[in-house]
Design a protein with these regions (language model features):
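Glycine-rich phosphate-binding loop and adjacent beta-alpha segment
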Residues: 4, 60-132
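Adenosine-nucleotide cofactor-binding segment
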Residues: 3-64
Length: 132
C-alpha cells in the first residue's frame, strides 16, 4: 500500500505490537484491537474511510471496519481467525444480513483467496516488491 502512496493503518493487540507496526514496519498508524475504544479509535484514524481492507480476522474487528468502508472498497479475504475454533454461531447480534446489502449499495468487491492456490510460486516476486 505505501509503495502505491496509500495511507496504511495496522490493527494489532497491545501498545507494543502497535509500536512495532508503526516504527519497524512503517505503517502510518496502528490501532489496538484490545482497547475498549477500538471502534472509535479506528474511525478517528480512518477519517476518510477505508478503500482496501485485508480481512484476516473477522469478529469485532470486521464489525468496526464495516461502517468505515467507502463506496467501491475492495476486501480480499484471506482468513477469519476470530472464528477458527468456533463450533457454534457467535454470540451477539447477527450482522450477516447487513453484509450483502452493504456490498450491493456501496458496490464493494469482496473475494476470498487461499494464497497458495494462485500465488505460491510467486513468493519471491512478491517479497522483492514489498520489502524495501
Amino acid at each position: 500500500g505505501k509503495i502505491k502512496g496509500l495511507k496504511v493503518v495496522g490493527i494489532a493487540g497491545g501498545s507494543e505490537k502497535c509500536r512495532y507496526v508503526v516504527e519497524e514496519l512503517g505503517f502510518d498508524a496502528c490501532v489496538d484491537h484490545k482497547s475498549d475504544t477500538f471502534a472509535d479509535d479506528l474511525a478517528k484514524v480512518c477519517d476518510k474511510g477505508i478503500d482496501i481492507y485485508f480481512e484476516n480476522v473477522g469478529g469485532k474487528v470486521f464489525d468496526a471496519v464495516m461502517p468505515l468502508l467507502n463506496a467501491r472498497a475492495r476486501i480480499p479475504v484471506c482468513g477469519l481467525i476470530a472464528g477458527y475454533n468456533a463450533t457454534d454461531l457467535p454470540e451477539g447480534p447477527d450482522r450477516f444480513a447487513l453484509l450483502p446489502r452493504m456490498l450491493l449499495t456501496k458496490r464493494i468487491r469482496m473475494q476470498g483467496f487461499i494464497v497458495f492456490d494462485d500465488f505460491g510460486d510467486r513468493h519471491a516476486e512478491f517479497f522483492s516488491a514489498m520489502v524495501p
